[in-house]
Design a protein with these regions (language model features):
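N-terminal regions encompassing targeting/leader/pre-sequences
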Residues: 1-2, 9
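Cationic, low-complexity basic patches in intrinsically disordered or flexible, solvent-exposed regions
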Residues: 3-4, 15-17
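Short, solvent-exposed coil/turn linker segments
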Residues: 4, 102-103, 159
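Short, Lys/Arg-enriched N-terminal segments with co-localized hydrophobic residues
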Residues: 9-11, 15, 21-37
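Non-globular targeting/processing and membrane-anchoring segments
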Residues: 32-114, 119-130, 134-144, 148, ...
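Residue-level marker for well-ordered alpha-helical positions
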Residues: 140, 161-164
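Thiol-based oxidoreductase modules, predominantly thioredoxin-like and allied folds used
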Residues: 147-162, 175-184
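Short, conserved SAM-binding/catalytic segment
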Residues: 166-174
Length: 266
C-alpha cells in the first residue's frame, strides 16, 4: 500500500501533489482488504484457526463500512424537511454569556448546517443523564473539528445557570451550550415526553436554504440511535467482553431522577 510521509508531502511540487491526490482518491474507492492485503497479514504466534476466523469477520466488517456509507449517501439525498416552526429563543449557558438570549437562527453563525443535540437534563433533575453526559464529554473534545464544517450546539431543558455549573464540573470548555427552559423547541421537535422533565436524547440537523431554515434529519429509531457518535459503546464492541450489561456508561455520579423515572419505572 502506498504511504505518504509528512516530509514527503512538504517537498512535493504542484504536479506531484496532483498525482498523489489522484492516487489517494482511487485508494478511497478501493476496498480496504484489497489495498492492505489483509490475507497476508499475521500477528506473532497466531494460529491458522484465528486467521481464518479473522478473515471471515473482516468481510463482515467491510460490508458494515459499505452499508454505513450507503446509508449516509441516502441521508444526504433527502429532500428538505419541514420549515422551522418558529425562530425559537434560547439562553446561552457558556461562560461569559450565561442567560443571554440567542435566537435559533443565530446558532448557525456563518454555517449553513446546524447539529443540535438535545440531552437529558430537566429543570427538576438532581443531576443530568449519565449517558448523555458521556456523549457530551466526547462532543466537547471534537467540537472544534466539527465546527469547521457545521455549527454544533447542545441543548437541555434545565436553566442556563445549572447547565453552566455542570459544564464546569465536567470540564466542558468548547461545545456551545444553550438552555431551552423557556422555549417550546424540545416539545415541538419530539425531544421530550408529556412534561419538561421527561426529556429524550435526540440529535437533529437543520439546514439554511434560500434564507429559510429547514429540518434535514433527526434520530427516529431507538435509544441506541446515537451509537455511531458514542465512543464508549463502540470501544467496548472491540473487546472480548463486549458491551457491559448496564443501562448507562460508568460514571462517578448518579442521577436519582433518571433512576426513579426511567430506569426503575414499571
Amino acid at each position: 500500500m502506498w504511504q505518504l510521509s509528512l516530509r514527503g508531502i512538504l517537498w512535493m511540487d504542484k504536479r506531484q501533489l496532483s498525482v498523489a491526490s489522484s492516487h489517494l482518491e482511487n485508494v478511497s474507492n478501493t476496498s480496504f482488504k484489497e489495498e492492505t492485503n489483509m490475507s497476508e497479514l499475521q500477528y506473532p504466534n497466531e494460529s491458522r484457526e484465528y486467521r481464518d476466523a479473522r478473515e471471515s469477520l473482516l468481510k463482515d466488517e467491510q460490508e458494515l463500512v459499505d452499508k454505513v456509507k450507503s446509508v449516509a449517501e441516502k441521508r444526504r439525498k433527502l429532500p428538505p424537511g419541514g420549515q422551522l416552526k418558529e425562530d425559537y429563543v434560547f439562553q446561552w449557558a457558556n461562560d461569559g454569556k450565561v442567560g443571554k438570549s440567542v435566537k435559533f437562527s443565530e446558532l448557525f453563525g456563518d454555517k449553513n448546517t446546524l447539529l443540535l443535540y438535545s440531552w437529558m437534563y430537566g429543570p427538576n433533575w438532581d443531576n443530568p443523564c449519565p449517558s448523555c453526559t458521556s456523549l457530551v464529554d466526547g462532543f466537547d473534545r471534537t467540537w472544534y473539528q466539527v465546527t469547521q464544517n457545521a455549527a454544533f450546539v447542545a441543548i437541555a431543558k434545565a436553566p442556563a445557570e445549572r447547565i453552566n455549573a455542570w459544564a464546569k464540573k465536567r470540564g466542558w470548555s468548547q461545545i456551545a451550550l444553550v438552555s431551552g427552559s423557556e422555549s417550546p423547541y424540545q416539545a415541538d421537535y419530539k425531544c421530550q415526553g408529556d412534561s419538561d422533565d421527561m426529556q429524550w436524547p435526540v440529535m437533529h440537523v437543520f439546514r439554511k436554504q434560500d434564507g429559510k431554515i429547514f429540518h434535514f434529519w433527526g434520530t427516529e429509531t431507538s435509544m441506541n440511535h446515537v451509537d455511531t457518535v458514542w465512543p464508549y459503546w463502540n470501544l467496548m464492541d472491540f473487546t472480548p467482553e463486549g458491551r457491559p450489561d448496564i443501562p448507562t456508561p460508568p460514571q462517578k455520579f448518579r442521577s436519582e431522577f433518571l433512576e426513579k423515572h426511567y430506569l426503575n419505572k414499571e
